[in-house]
């Protein structure tokens, strides 16, 4: 199995003068779900190279065993140093795609034409996709082959209004994920702030927050395996000829 993980290249938190980027747990936790299962992982970002880490995600209160493992993993860090440019990757080379979150994706991946076309290409090929937290915002312009918005009528989740309010960034982000999904006609599913929550609707798998990133990756991997199962046909019945 081959998975493409797409990470933000955006490092400015609106006009606050503070840094943002990807959220470390949302990269590290899915990364090891895939790696420990023997999945081949490719990392990409809009600009390529080393993507920006949201420094807050590496503060002691947000560190986990997996974020610490990632930081000590020379191979993982080497991959992160050399992410591919998003415009250089093709859907045909992968079985699935996963979008870690962080606030950064709301500024770049939500509007990136290569990201939008790539998601559309995966879905058109019948391949499941996984997205967590703020990266659900990267679905806002994705369309179906008939021109209908992907999320219209779809059940999705992502970083909630309540969670955004709790981190004090409601007035900073370019849009609120929950409000945007509802505006676009999605059925927005959520649990209490910071609870694990993963939603599957067809080929689309979404997770609510950082704690949902590992379960979302596991759900995505199961969906890829299920799709790859060979169809078992019944053996033909042999009827004895009679004179």
Predicted regions and their residues:
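Catalytic, metal-anchored helix/loop core of enzyme active sites in primary metabolism
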Residues: 133
